[in-house]
């Protein structure tokens, strides 16, 4: 979000649900905006947001949700995909690097972007899914702030990748400082003001994909 695409897919998903009356337009939009502002400030409670954003997934049959998601991707996300981001992903693929998307956005929403970029490793917040239905609960730790580091470390261990030479990490958000500090090649992409200053202080590379 705001790195490979010019926008936030979690926020856009909420807007899409509102615009198509899958949720109560007024109350859901207000809360969606509130949570997004908290995210930008770095004060978001990810578990609270999970309960809010996963609840609509419990209302519909899974196949209906898949249809909604497909329309959402084509209408909302596809126009936000950055050509330079596609070039960057292809550069790493051609370099035989192992790619992963690490995102606070839940896996149901972020999977369509991962599929578009043909990146098979997706580390995301996981909505609980039991007997073919979403329960509205969070499964495991949120993939947010320090939680991203935990998920990346587990992914490295589980995929026998501990002998890596470098880990490149691209992000726009100061919420990802912990993961930037963990990785050997942190790169700020069109960073927010806070991350921009931190990147300058740490002499981290800053690029634009816009």
Predicted regions and their residues:
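Catalytic cores of transferase enzymes with a strong primary signal for eukaryotic protein kinases
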Residues: 7, 18, 45, 63-65, ...
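Short, compositionally biased "basic patch" segments
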Residues: 36-63, 122, 126
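Conserved active-site and cofactor/substrate-binding residues in soluble primary-metabolism enzymes
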Residues: 8, 60, 147
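C-terminal cap/substrate-recognition subdomain and adjoining C-terminal extension
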Residues: 67-70, 74-210
């Amino acid at each position: 979000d705001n790195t490979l695409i010019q926008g936030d897919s979690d926020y856009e998903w909420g807007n899409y649900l509102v615009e198509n009356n899958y949720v109560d337009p007024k109350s859901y939009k207000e809360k969606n905006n509130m949570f997004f502002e908290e995210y930008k400030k770095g004060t978001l409670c990810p578990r609270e947001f999970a309960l809010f954003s996963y609840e609509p997934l419990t209302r519909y049959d899974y196949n209906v949700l898949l249809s909604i998601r497909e329309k959402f991707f084509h209408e909302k996300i596809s126009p936000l995909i950055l050509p330079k981001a596609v070039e960057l992903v292809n550069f790493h693929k051609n370099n035989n690097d192992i790619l992963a998307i690490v995102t606070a956005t839940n896996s149901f929403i972020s999977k369509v972007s991962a599929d578009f970029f043909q990146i098979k490793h997706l580390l995301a917040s996981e909505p609980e899914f039991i007997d073919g239905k979403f329960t509205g609960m969070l499964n495991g730790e949120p993939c947010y702030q320090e939680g991203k580091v935990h998920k990346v470390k587990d992914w490295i261990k589980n995929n026998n990748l501990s002998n890596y030479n470098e880990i490149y990490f691209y992000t726009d958000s100061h919420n990802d400082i912990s993961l930037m500090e963990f990785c050997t090649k942190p790169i700020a992409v069109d960073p927010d003001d806070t991350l921009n200053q931190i990147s300058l202080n740490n002499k981290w590379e800053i690029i634009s994909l816009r």
